[in-house]
Amino acid sequence: MIHLRLMQEIHSITKDHFPPFLLPLLEIPEPPEKIYYEGMLPEKEEGVKVLAVVGSRKHTRYGKDITQKLLEGLRGYPIIIVSGLALGIDGIAHQKALDIGLTTISVPGSGIAYKNLYP
């Protein structure tokens, strides 16, 4: 049963233990006390950058092409791609990043509880 499997793999981390790439969250008004995540958080090595890529669910052909070209230009660089988990540009960004060997982090706007996921 997928719902149970997902719930068993959800972890949390308190703000006192955020890895370096999450520390900017502490600079916003009312930062989160805890972050929930599934899977493994990537190791943040010296020189690795984190880049957010977001866009429309109802993208144009140009939007798709330019997203893929921009990410292709990052091939081989020490970059982690962060995007939503929505259909459209978010999904295109994740797929292209994975195709060229980059690490990705998905941040669904609806939270990670299975019943709340919305593409």
Predicted regions and their residues:
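Glycine-biased, small-residue-rich flexible motifs in mid-sequence functional cores and linkers
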Residues: 2-119
